[in-house]
Amino acid sequence: MDLELKGKTVFITGSTAGIGFATAKALLSEGASVVLNGRTPASVTTAVKKLEQEFPNESVSGIAADFSLPKEVNSLLENLPKIDILINNVGVYSSGSFFETEDAAWYRQFEVNVMSGVRLSKSLLPRMLTTNWGRILFISSECASLTPPDLIPYSMTKAAVLAVSRGLAQLTKGTDVTVNSVIPGSTLSEGAEQFLEDAAQKEQKTKDQIESAFFTEVRTTSLLQRFAKVEEVAHTITYLASPRSSATNGAAIKVDGVSSGGLF
């Protein structure tokens, strides 16, 4: 299926690794032009070079910006090219006791995970509405509903982006602009890979044994009974970013194998 993404320019925050990087690859394979983002120039340059080697005939560039620093965000907004599709993927988290987590950790996670998408949407949505076409996607998490007790600040931010996404969708009524969110379940990102390796070494087990135990003991409702691949999440994001998804608006699409539970 041709997703009709040729000629579209996409900006993906937090896209030098993990789901963001996999999404960039999927979009480039469909002929879209992609602008990457990471916190440091070095990480952005490395990611851009990798994609240029894999997709020599496609357009890929990058802009470094730390979304916890408003000055860098303002500079990014000034240097962005015309964007047709915005994917708000950047996210940070810190794990710890609710009683010991300082206010600064709450503020930083909210600033990066929520306000990055708010500021970018405020800047880019008006033009999308004027031209009557655009896509905005917010990448949430199963933590928005599961809320692990050691990830309460992070979970709060991922619930917040669902509200922002749903509210912005209301502003697109009657247009060909859509705003949706994606809710990945446990995904085999670089961080998850490291978790499996560390746990396997600590418990003197194989990574497969650790993964199996995680889903039989922790994510018991998961129908997948495994971590999703970043490519699997990226394929869903790519479809929602395309013109083919024109009837999907204001939705929160789960890619979690029911790990977060619930009938819907």
Predicted segment positions?
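Short, small/polar-rich loop/turn modules that mediate ligand/substrate recognition or access, typified
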Residues: 173, 178, 248-250
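Substrate-binding pocket helix/loop in short-chain dehydrogenase/reductase
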Residues: 73, 97-98, 105-110, 218
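Active-site helix of classical SDR
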Residues: 121, 157, 165
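Residue(s) in the substrate-gating loop at a strand-loop-helix junction
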Residues: 141
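Conserved glycine-rich cofactor-binding loop
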Residues: 9, 16-18
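Alpha-helical segment proximal to the catalytic Tyr-Lys
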Residues: 126, 170-171, 246
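Short C-terminal tail/terminal secondary-structure segment
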Residues: 146, 237-238, 245, 249-264
